[in-house]
Amino acid sequence: MTDDSDVRLSHGRHVYLDYINFNPEVEDMGTWILSLLRTSVKECEVKEVHAHCEVFDGVESPPGFAAVVLIDESHVTAHCYSERGWLAIDAFTCGTHDPNDLADVIHAKLVAGCENLKLMNRNVVKRFLHDDISQNKE
């Protein structure tokens, strides 16, 4: 493991959002959130590569879903424990787009669609850390 004090640059950022009280009044939460993620990606003018949602019925995994939108710069995902009202979102980009913009758009849509939704944590982490100035593209 290296000493982080030597790392000066990064080539990507990862935004994490953690919510409670995620209980939108929709029939299929997984389909709804996947549509919300895809719309947010499009509004931020990020290129979508693939999208998928897997709904968990509680038999092998706790009830909820995992949704992913692969983008040309990495991904945007959502994971939900529906019985607990927990929702985790992450947006990771390693190109010209700012994942904070994606997170802001997603957050606004979630708040508009989910009464009592509460953001518990928002964290931004630099990714692809390096100390080679010649490799920095940001």
Regions found by a protein language model. Name each.
Residues 1-138:
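Polybasic/polar functional segments that serve as interface/processing modules
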